[in-house]
Amino acid sequence: MSEKDLRGILESSNDKLSVFADRDTLASCDNLTEKDLISLIDNYLNDSQKLDLLNFEHFRKLRGQVRVDIAMSISDSNLRLQLLLTPDGPFSDLYTYQFNDLLESLDSSCKLKLLKNSHSLQSLKLGKDSIESMAKSLSDSDKFTFLSDIDYLNKELKLSEYSISRIICSVNDENVKLHLLDVVPLDNYYKTDILTTISNTTKASIILNNTYNLKPHEASQVLGSMDTDFFIDYVNEHTDFFSKNGISIQSVVRYFPMKEQISFANKIYNINISVR
């Protein structure tokens, strides 16, 4: 039987899933490639049927990438998630990198459900790097939900402060990011890293008001992440700030990228001489 004959059987069948369920029918099809099989499945089965298909024993024995490609053809993100949440599901024998595309294909709400299921994460052998990567791809609101559960992060996932801070840095909405700084207990070392990712104006306000009780070298790092022109204006506007807080211009400039250091050197005469 050819691939064309198999297609004809599927066209005329009222129970297309049963055709794929019949191991002998598929085995009798000569030269049926993996690509042909995936195409037939995508053309003739709906999402829920594809879900059932991946639980058939002969389909669970297919090469890992073929199983992933079948799952990727399921349009409903919740159904794709269901495959991942199923104990001893069709991907339990695979390494994370083999079904990473499937993880990435989930929408944010489904990724959050998976991240909040520590048993499934363990069953899928998802390491901390994979968990961090998935968390970074969440929407800002879902990141907040995920990161706000401190006990779960610490006791179940055992995420390090470094990983948590990297996820917070990936938040796009500055207000959400600052709210997380108030909610998530972090060492100032990591808070400083996060503060370097916010807007110049907000950095200026935080440093001026010492909102997070930063030490001079930590404040210098945040100031050193400002744009050169903005920093020069900040220096000229708050001439007493540096001497009062034990911060030197040099300690800030060393945090500038090399290109910014050169730019600053060319503009140093724009700085109030009393501060220089």
Enumerate the predicted regions with their spans.
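Ankyrin repeat (ANK) tandem alpha-helical domains that serve as protein-protein interaction scaffolds
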Residues: 1-276
